[in-house]
């Protein structure tokens, strides 16, 4: 049996943030969500989250995971104290306990699988991840005997100058035999420079302690401040972009772009500089994004062009052109072969196939049919000061420049609306409508 405990109780004071450290985003996911993601394939019987500082925020952010058991650590008195809080929850449990940190987000599932396999085959009391670092500052040092058994781990702040020269470090990721661990947990003390109860002190109390060295030390990098957060963001972005370039996506200037891990691409996609994808995005074959576009939780079909535009929670059809400087807001559906031009805003609207809204227009809460032409400066006036109202325009209709359609309103098919008109009544099919005040012209002599 396998139980997994993720430590997420710390204050994260070096982040200088009101947000709990484990909730800071990294390539679109919180740190702790990333840690949870690498545990799914391990098929644990239990997953426990140790919370403390701003516990409610952390718990609320993880409600989508139905199998989590939250354990409160109050006060936060060290990693050993955190694991002591698990004893009532794991009463009667007979198996392995994998201990992870909520601020170590780059771990791979494969690494944890290898750790578990090594631990079980070695019949160890505890096995933990380790690494040899050229610059081990900040990490506890691992000390072994001639046979390779771990004798002790000393936290850096408690090391002598000579002990600090040791480059073998503890990554803080442990696999314990729970029964053996629970027998020694109450023997831990806080006799150290921090007056905290260290989980590392269990190493010298257990029968057989081993370490398992990781292939890629960056995988165990913890995040304590925003500099380290930025370093991890850069690392993930490089991984993501390299992956998609190997699958047929071109980045003109990769370093200036960012992706979310939930982004998916077809082939022959070109991504120009300063383009960013956030949340869950699906980008079809042959799309050309940017420069300067931001796409969030949206689906773009094939051969979509999006230049200097914001697309948020929208669906864009094949062979559609967006921008430059267009804003497609949530719940919008732009059908194939359409054009949304410069300085156009679309909000919660369906735009039919082949429809063109080329410039300087606002279309909100509307349903437009196919092959419609919306003239420059056309506005759907959807808000009466209290409620939003719908505008419907049927196929093959046209609006002249500077038209205002006052919702609720329905414009029929094959309707032409003259420039400068303000329309507040429904218009039947095949109509020509011009509604504007008569010009009054006077000479200066008058």
UniProtKB/Swiss-Prot annotation:
Region of interest (Pyrophosphorylase), ranges: 1-226
Claim: Magnesium is one of the keywords in the record: yes
Residue positions binding UDP-N-acetyl-alpha-D-glucosamine: 7-10, 21, 73, 78-79, 140, 155, 170, 224, 329, 347, 362, 373
GO CC term (a single one): membrane
Keyword Transport in record: no
Cofactor(s) required, per the database record: Mg(2+)
Gene3D superfamilies named among the record's database cross-references: Hexapeptide repeat proteins, Spore Coat Polysaccharide Biosynthesis Protein SpsA, Chain A
Cell compartment(s), UniProt: Cytoplasm
A Pfam cross-reference name: Hexapep
Highest taxon, organism lineage: Bacteria
CDD domains xrefs: GT2_GlmU_N_bac, LbH_GlmU_C
SUPFAM superfamilies to which the protein is assigned, alphabetical: Nucleotide-diphospho-sugar transferases (SSF53448), Trimeric LpxA-like enzymes (SSF51161)
Keyword field: Acyltransferase, Cell shape, Cell wall biogenesis/degradation, Cytoplasm, Magnesium, Metal-binding, Multifunctional enzyme, Nucleotidyltransferase, Peptidoglycan synthesis, Repeat, Transferase
Recorded catalytic activity of this chain's protein: alpha-D-glucosamine 1-phosphate + acetyl-CoA = N-acetyl-alpha-D-glucosamine 1-phosphate + CoA + H(+); N-acetyl-alpha-D-glucosamine 1-phosphate + UTP + H(+) = UDP-N-acetyl-alpha-D-glucosamine + diphosphate
Pathway where this protein functions: Nucleotide-sugar biosynthesis; UDP-N-acetyl-alpha-D-glucosamine biosynthesis; N-acetyl-alpha-D-glucosamine 1-phosphate from alpha-D-glucosamine 6-phosphate (route II): step 2/2; Nucleotide-sugar biosynthesis; UDP-N-acetyl-alpha-D-glucosamine biosynthesis; UDP-N-acetyl-alpha-D-glucosamine from N-acetyl-alpha-D-glucosamine 1-phosphate: step 1/1; Bacterial outer membrane biogenesis; LPS lipid A biosynthesis
Annotated NCBIfam families: glmU, PRK14360.1
PANTHER family according to UniProt: BIFUNCTIONAL PROTEIN GLMU, NUCLEOTIDYL TRANSFERASE
Assembly description: Homotrimer.
Family of this protein: In the N-terminal section; belongs to the N-acetylglucosamine-1-phosphate uridyltransferase family.
Name of the protein described by the UniProt record: Bifunctional protein GlmU
Gene behind this protein: glmU
